[in-house]
């Protein structure tokens, strides 16, 4: 869950988000080292009286500043590709949920059940109860079992939307006429909030997403009551 004046990313709830946090730290360290080196060189140039105005050729330096950036790019690309393949891999999902974006709400259909579907609208500010979050609460939460692989099929009925839940490391575009898919697995129970992350019209800011991750026994009870 995000909080005011937060500087870092949200706490990881899924294995994918944990990998993304590690990759963020890895890349940030490389950027910090490069920035420190550049700042050191600039400071050295401004403070030293040594100049090389007569230097016409420096093949050793050219070789270093060609090979070193290539190595740095490889160090960034390899873990990035690994995470991309992890995000694209879908193996035997335990549950499939179809998500459709609309202007301006989400609809959900549990395809493994015969008649389990609902729309999810944002709760207006004037109807919020004490402790509920402004612009993030919905009338129907998406209840899912924790510690199980869930496949999300995502599309749109009208314009471009984007289904995103930061703490799970999820962001998938909802495109009219196209069905995108992603997987999620939460390692602990709780409420996880997201929002539409593609500008989709005047009420784009009023399309929250709320996932309620629960133990399997609770999910089975909930699904039986909903059907």
UniProtKB/Swiss-Prot annotation:
Its main location: mitochondrion. Cu cation A2 binds at residues 196, 198, 200, 204. Residues 46-59 are mitochondrial matrix. Its EC number is 7.1.1.9. Cu cation A1 binds at residues 161, 196, 200, 207. One of its GO terms (cellular component) is mitochondrial inner membrane. GO terms for molecular function: copper ion binding; cytochrome-c oxidase activity. One of its GO terms (biological process) is ATP synthesis coupled electron transport. Keywords: Copper, Electron transport, Magnesium, Membrane, Metal-binding, Mitochondrion, Mitochondrion inner membrane, Phosphoprotein, Respiratory chain, Translocase, Transmembrane, Transmembrane helix, Transport. The modification Phosphotyrosine is found at residue 218. Its cofactor is Cu cation. It is found in: Mitochondrion inner membrane. Gene3D superfamilies: 1.10.287.90, Cupredoxins - blue copper proteins (2.60.40.420). Pfam families: COX2 (PF00116), COX2_TM (PF02790). Binds a dinuclear copper A center per subunit. InterPro entries: CcO_II, CcO_II-like_C, CcO_II_C, Copper_CuA, Cupredoxin, Cyt_c_oxidase_su2, Cyt_c_oxidase_su2_TM_dom, Cyt_c_oxidase_su2_TM_sf. It catalyses: 4 Fe(II)-[cytochrome c] + O2 + 8 H(+)(in) = 4 Fe(III)-[cytochrome c] + 2 H2O + 4 H(+)(out). Residues 1-14, 88-227 are mitochondrial intermembrane. PANTHER family: CYTOCHROME C OXIDASE SUBUNIT 2, CYTOCHROME C OXIDASE, SUBUNIT II. Component of the cytochrome c oxidase (complex IV, CIV), a multisubunit enzyme composed of 14 subunits. The complex is composed of a catalytic core of 3 subunits MT-CO1, MT-CO2 and MT-CO3, encoded in the mitochondrial DNA, and 11 supernumerary subunits COX4I, COX5A, COX5B, COX6A, COX6B, COX6C, COX7A, COX7B, COX7C, COX8 and NDUFA4, which are encoded in the nuclear genome. Belongs to the cytochrome c oxidase subunit 2 family. This is Cytochrome c oxidase subunit 2. It comes from Vulpes macrotis. The lineage of its organism: Eukaryota, Metazoa, Chordata, Craniata, Vertebrata. The gene is MT-CO2.
């Amino acid at each position: 869950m995000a909080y005011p004046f937060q500087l870092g990313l949200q706490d990881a709830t899924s294995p994918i988000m944990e990998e993304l946090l590690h990759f963020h730290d890895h890349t940030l360290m490389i950027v910090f080292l490069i920035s420190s080196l550049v700042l050191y060189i600039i400071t050295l140039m401004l403070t030293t009286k040594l100049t090389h105005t007569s230097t016409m050729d420096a093949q050793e330096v050219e070789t270093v500043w060609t090979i070193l950036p290539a190595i740095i790019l490889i160090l960034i690309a390899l873990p990035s590709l690994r995470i991309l393949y992890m995000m694209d891999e879908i193996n035997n999902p335990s549950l499939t949920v179809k998500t459709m974006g609309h202007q301006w709400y989400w609809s959900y259909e549990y395809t493994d059940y015969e008649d389990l579907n609902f729309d999810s609208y944002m709760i207006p500010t004037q109807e919020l109860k004490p402790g509920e979050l402004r612009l993030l609460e919905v009338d129907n939460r998406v209840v899912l079992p924790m510690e199980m692989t869930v496949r999300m099929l995502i599309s749109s009925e009208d314009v471009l939307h984007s289904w995103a839940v930061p703490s799970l490391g999820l962001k998938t575009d909802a495109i009219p006429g196209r069905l995108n898919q992603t997987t999620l697995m939460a390692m602990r129970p709780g409420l996880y909030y997201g929002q539409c992350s593609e500008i989709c019209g005047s009420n784009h800011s009023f399309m929250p997403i709320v996932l309620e991750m629960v133990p399997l026994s609770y999910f089975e009870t909930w699904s039986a009551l909903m059907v």
